[in-house]
Amino acid sequence: MSFFSVLSELLEASGFAALTWQNIAMILVSFVLFYLAIVKKFEPLLLLPISFGMFLVNLPLAGLMDEGGVINIMSYGVKSNLFPCLVFMGVGAMTDFSPLIANPISLLLGAAAQLGIYVAFIFATQIGFTPAEAAAIGIIGGADGPTSIYIANNLAPHLLAPIAVAAYSYMALIPLIQPPIMKALTTKKERAVKMGQLRKVSKTEKIVFPIAVVLFTSLLLPSVAPLLGLLMLGNLFRESGVVQRLSDTAQNALINIITIMLGLSVGAKAEGATFLDISTLKIIAMGLAAFCFSTIGGVLLGKLLYLITGGKINPLIGSAGVSAVPMAARVSQTVGAKENPTNFLLMHAMGPNVAGVIGSAVAAGFFMMVFKGTM
C-alpha cells in the first residue's frame, strides 16, 4: 500500500470529504456569533455556548448528536423541558421583584411588550404555519428562551431547533436590536426623564408575592405551572432568608451549569443540512418581527403613560417589558444615560422586565390551553 493511497483513504474518511456547503455556511455564522460574544460582548454567557454548539455540530462525522453522543445526551434536558424549568428557578433566585411590587403599573408595560407575540402569531398563520406552529413561533417575541423551548416542545417539536436558536440569538442581540427602535419612537426630552425613587417593599410583600402569583396563574392556566412554579420557587428561596445555600446554588452553580448545557444543546440544533431551509428563514424573520413589535408595544405604552402622568414616567422603561432579564433593563439604562448621564433607570426598568417574564409565560400558557389539541 503506497503512501498516496493511505493519504487518499485518510482524506476520504476525514471530515473534509463529508463537509457540505451547508456546514460551511453554519460554521461561518458561528464565527460571526463568536465575534459578537467575545469582541462586542453581546450577552456572552448565552451567545458563546450557543455559537460553539453550532460550530461543533457542523464539523462532519464528529458524532456529537449521534445516539450516545455527548451533546445528544445533554439535549434530553431541552426535549424534556427540564433545562428551561431549572433556568427559570435560577432566574427567580436572582430576581428582585421589588420594582414590580413597588410600581404595579409595570405590569401594564410588561403586558404591552408582549405585542410582538400576537403580531407574529397572526403573520405566521398567514404564511402557511398551523395555529399551533404560529403560537410557538410568536413566543420568540417575548425574548424568553426557556419559554420558547417549553412551548415549542409542547406545540411544535419539529420546529424546536430554529425557534430555540432564534429566541436565544435575539435575546443575546438585544443591545443591537432595541436602541434604534427606542430612539426612533421617543424624543430627546422623553429619554432624559428622571423618575422618582421607588418605595421600600416589605419582606412580607416579597414573600407573599411569589406564592400569590403561582396560585393565581396556575389555577387560571395550569399548563404554565412548571415554568412559573419554579421561577417563584427560586424567588422564594431568595426572599425567605432561611435557605441561603439553596438560593446561592440556584442563582450561581446550578444556573451556570444549566446555561452551558442549554447553550450547547440549542446551538447544536443548527446543523446545516436540516437548519438551512425556507421554513427556518421564515421563523427567523418572524422572530425578529415579533421582537421588534414587542419593543414597539412597550415603548408606545410608555409614551402614553408619560403623557398621562405629566412626564413622570420615562418611555424607555417600556422596552424592558420583554422578558430578557436583566439584558433589556440594562439597555433602557444605557440609552437613558446617554441622554442624561445622571439618570438611573435600571431599577425602574426592572419592574417591566420581570413583569415580562410573567407575561410571556402566561401567553405561552394561553396558547397551550387553546392549541394543545390541534397539533
Write out the residue ranges for each language-model feature:
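N-terminal alpha-helical transmembrane segments of multi-pass membrane transport
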Residues: M1-G69
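Interfacial helix-loop-helix linkers and transmembrane-helix boundary segments
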Residues: V39-L47, L64-M74, M94-L109, V243-Q251, ...
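Alpha-helical membrane segments and immediately flanking helix-loop junctions
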Residues: Y76, S80, F88-M94, L109-V119, ...
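Membrane-embedded hairpin module used as a gating/binding unit in multi-pass transport
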Residues: S169-V242
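Transmembrane helical segments that form the transport core of multi-pass membrane transport proteins
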Residues: V214-G298
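Hydrophobic transmembrane alpha-helices of secondary-active transporters
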Residues: L33, F55-L56, G77-I101, G234-F237, ...
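Alpha-helical transmembrane segments
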Residues: L159-L176, M286-S294, I317-A320
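Entry/N-cap segments of selected transmembrane alpha helices
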Residues: L100-F121, E271-G298, A349-N353
